[in-house]
Amino acid sequence: MAVLTNPTAGRGRYRALLPGLLDGLAVAGRPIRLLPASSPAEAEAACRAAVADGAGALVAVGGDGTVHRALQAVAGTDVPFGPIPAGTGNDFALDTGFPADPLAAAVMIGEALRDGRSRPVDLARMVGVDGAERWYGAVLAAGFDAIVNERANRMRWPRGPRRYDLAILVELARLRPRRYTLRLDGVPHDLDAVLVAVGNCPTYGGGMRICPDADPTDGLLDVVVAGRVNRRTLVRVKPRIYQGTHVSHPLVRSFRARTVEVAAEGITSYADGERSLALPVTISAVPAALRLLR
C-alpha cells in the first residue's frame, strides 16, 4: 500500500495524526510505503511511480489538492484508492462517502483493502486544445472562482487566507460577464456568464454545493452557470451556494451532459481547487474510472 502524505495539509495538522492514521491503515495487513513529497509535482510523480511499480493500493492523506495529484496516477486503472480527509477542503472524500474524521476514514480504507472491497465511482477527464489531459474528482471552476484563484496565486502579499480575500475584492470590482460557448453532448450554447462550474460531485471550496444534484455514480456531469449577474447579486447569492439553493435564482441555469466543452477567452480553469488547463477544454464523464476503498 502506497500512502501519499502532504506535510502542509490542514496547515500541518496531519503530522500529529499520522501515527494513528497508519495504525488504522495497518488493519489491511499490507506493507505500507510512505510517499512524502515537497511539491505538487513531486507528489504526482511519486504516485505515478508507485502505481507503475505495482502498488496494491494508493492512499492520499490531505485535502482535495492532494487527492487531485493522486487521481492522475490511479484514474482508469485497477489500483484501488482511498482519500483520508486531512486538508482544509475535503470535498471529494466527503462527497464519496468517507467520514470526516481522518482516523475513521483510515480504518474504513484499511478494512476495505483487507476484505477486498471497493466501490466504483466516476471521474471527469479533461482535455485541452494541445491534447494535455487531466482528471478531476469533484468540480471544475471556469468563471469568477477560477479568476479569483488565478489572481490570488499571482499575489505575493498578504500571505495566508487574507490573500484570497483580497483577490475576491479586487475581482469583484472588475466583475463583468464573459462570453462562453458551451457544447453539451454536441449541442452548442452561447451565453454571457460570470460563473461556470462543471461537477462530477456536488461540492467545492470546502463544502459549497455549487452543483447540488451532481452524482459521481450516474455517468453524467452537472453544469451550473450564473449569467449576467452584477456585483450586488453575486454577493447576495454566493452564501446560498453552501445549501445549494442558488440554483433556484432566475439568473442561474443548470444542465447535465456526458461531454461538456467549455470555451472562453483568457480563463485558466481550476479543478479540485488546483490550477489546471486554459480554456477551451473538453470534459467527459468516465463511468467507474476509480475504485474507492470503502
Give the predicted meaning of each segment.
Residues 192-237, 243:
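Internal helical hairpin/lid segments
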Residues 2, 28, 37, 75-80, ...:
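Catalytic core of DAGKc-family lipid kinases
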Residues 1-58, 103-107:
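ATP/NTP phosphate-donor binding region
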Residues 7, 61-63, 84-86, 200:
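Glycine-rich beta-strand-to-loop/alpha-helix junction loops that act as flexible
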Residues 14, 184, 215, 225-294:
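ATP/nucleoside-binding phosphotransfer catalytic cores, i.e., glycine-rich phosphate-binding loops
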Residues 43, 65-70, 91, 121:
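Short glycine/serine/threonine-rich phosphate/pyrophosphate-binding segments
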Residues 7, 128-130, 140-146, 199-202, ...:
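Glycine-rich beta-alpha junction loops
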